[in-house]
């Protein structure tokens, strides 16, 4: 059955505080950003790496995945890709050191039209990273959201790697941006799903994925406000029907992590605790007290 994870950064308490909080609310594991702050891949080596391993062991937490998201436009811009590809390879190396075989990332907006030059640019970058990941026994999991499930599946099919590329399934992104039918999206992407985010949201009015993600990449666009179009909400309060979603996800054979990602809210710890309780109730597991105070 599913495991419950939490993104350490969602607590907004730093690494130590986030690990402690994750243990206290009964998470099975954590996802950690490896591209910024104290867990940047450049810093996770030597004594720092040993220290993190020790903390994870003490709190009895495993790493569900590393987040290797570099922000910006992902892998849409050819001249930026060589460095991003090499940095992603380094994140993959850190993932192995921490005992996880999954690295998640946003790659940008995959064009609907395969004739769009950006499609080939992104495919080449993903092929290089995916081939490296496959050789290392790791899966680079592309997060859902900017494009619909069919477009992403065809993109992965076109690249043709058997193991090195996968999907980090975020149902809220698909609801907020694409207004997707989540159970159907799961069925479409099932062969590739290796990790998921537990998040909920609503689409307030139709929005262009290009415009929305360009706004995120560029730190805002004058006259465009993302919150006019999409809104993240607590689990169970948005457009994701978790009963049908988890049922179909289970039927596909997925038994990995449901990793809570909370990017808004004034009291993230309280929100995450409620999210854990919500998910435990759905998967039939009892809440248990923190492992270490």
Residue ranges and their predicted role:
Residues 4, 29, 66, 124-239, ...:
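Acidic/histidine-rich catalytic cores of soluble enzymes
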Residues 7-11, 33-35, 68-71, 108-110, ...:
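Active-site beta-loop-alpha junctions enriched in small/polar residues
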Residues 29, 102, 195, 256-257:
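Residues at the N-termini of beta-strands
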Residues 43-51, 79-87, 114-124, 147, ...:
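Alpha-helix N-cap and loop-to-helix initiation/capping positions
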Residues 237-251:
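A short, acidic, amphipathic alpha-helical segment used as a generic capping/interface helix at domain edges
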């Amino acid at each position: 059955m599913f495991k419950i994870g939490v993104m350490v950064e969602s607590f907004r308490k730093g690494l130590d505080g986030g690990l402690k909080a994750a243990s206290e609310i009964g998470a099975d594991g954590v996802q950690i950003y490896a591209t910024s702050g104290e867990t940047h891949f450049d810093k996770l080596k030597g004594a720092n790496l040993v220290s993190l391993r020790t903390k994870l062991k003490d709190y009895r937490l495993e790493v569900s995945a590393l987040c290797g998201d570099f922000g910006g436009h992902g892998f849409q811009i050819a001249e930026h890709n060589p460095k991003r590809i090499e940095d992603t390879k380094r994140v993959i190396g850190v993932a192995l050191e921490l005992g996880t075989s999954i690295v998640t990332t946003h790659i940008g907006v995959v064009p609907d039209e395969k004739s769009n030059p950006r499609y080939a640019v992104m495919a080449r970058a993903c092929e290089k990273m995916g081939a490296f990941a496959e050789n290392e026994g790791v899966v680079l999991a592309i997060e859902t959201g900017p494009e619909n499930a069919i477009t992403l599946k065809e993109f992965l099919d076109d690249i043709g790697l058997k193991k090195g590329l996968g999907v980090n399934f975020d149902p809220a992104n698909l609801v907020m941006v694409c207004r997707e039918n989540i159970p159907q999206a799961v069925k479409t992407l099932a062969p590739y799903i290796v990790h998921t985010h537990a998040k909920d949201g609503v689409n307030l009015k139709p929005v262009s994925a290009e415009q929305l993600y360009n706004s995120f990449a560029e730190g805002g666009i004058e006259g465009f406000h993302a919150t006019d179009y999409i809104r993240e909400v607590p689990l169970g309060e948005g457009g994701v029907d978790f009963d049908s979603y988890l049922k179909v996800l289970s039927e596909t054979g997925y038994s990995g992590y449901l990793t809570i990602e909370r990017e808004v809210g004034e009291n993230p710890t309280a929100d995450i605790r409620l999210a854990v309780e919500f998910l435990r109730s759905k998967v039939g597991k009892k809440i248990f007290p923190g492992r270490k105070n």
